Amino acid sequence: GAAGNIGAETVANAAPDGYTLLESPDATFTINPLVYQKLNFKPESIVPLTALVTFSQMLVCHPSVPVKTVADLRAHAKARPLSYASGGVGSPGHLVMEMFLSATGVPMNHVPYKGPVPAAQDLLSGQVACAFLVTNAVAPHVKAGRLVGLAMSGRKRSNLVPEVPTMQEAGVPNYDATFSEMLYVPRGV
């Protein structure tokens, strides 16, 4: 809950005896301290043990948006500003999209949701035009034609949708937004 802050607080206050672990995205410690005015824990009281998985997000659009590539999206959105969904202000999907908009000069209206699931639901129903969402959640919808996959946020293509290029391959140089799911322990373990 609270973008990982509740779990992090629990681990920060736990005895460093090896019995308390935190599985959390790296965003809990890279983004949250910048977004939340008050954290009920000190990030330095928790240390990373290992990265469990590294992943990218996929830029996807509703099929009603007449785009098949990042170049199409750039041209279409400049002519007719679109809306994009995210899992909330400061969420990885929000920041990755803002990074894209900054790199390309594309104007879009942000529609923040209370988590990525309602954002994906409204994207699938066509209430918003596009979003950056976790690949394994949207890949089946891309394969079924319910969403159009435009680009991966990271440096590598996904094995789930190898036909979807990276953002760099799609013409956005130096773009890389990769995330990790981490295992953390209280300092002193």
Language model: regions and residue ranges:
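Adenylate-forming
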Residues: 5-8, 29-34, 94
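Short helices/loops that flank or line small-molecule/ion binding pockets
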Residues: 5-16, 98-99, 103, 117-131, ...
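Conserved helix-loop-beta element of the AMP-binding
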Residues: 47, 73, 146-158, 176
